């Protein structure tokens, strides 16, 4: 592993009352394929229709910002971009 690359805490915030959990788990499954780039992964159930993915506290994907659920590939691309600089 290249130690110059950043390791990330990934936080997936999802609306538990809106049944967003299946999408959160699908994103989690894909994110875990990059486990050597991760320092921590957090699933955070919230309310209010929220579905967000944050990398080290910075919003990288959002259902409300993107007018729909971010795809797993979109999330992985955002993580790769954040990692590389």
Segments (PLM) and residue ranges:
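Generic domain-boundary/flexible-linker signal
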Residues: 21-23, 52, 64
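Short strand-loop junctions, especially beta-strand C-caps/beta-turns
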Residues: 13-17, 58, 63-65
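Amphipathic, hydrophobic secondary-structure cores in small proteins
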Residues: 40-52
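Non-catalytic, surface beta->alpha helical segment in thiol-disulfide oxidoreductase systems
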Residues: 60-85
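Local sequence-structure signature of Cys/Sec-based thiol-disulfide redox active-site neighborhoods
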Residues: 2-35
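A broad structural signal for alpha-helix termini and local helix breaks/kinks
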Residues: 35-36, 83
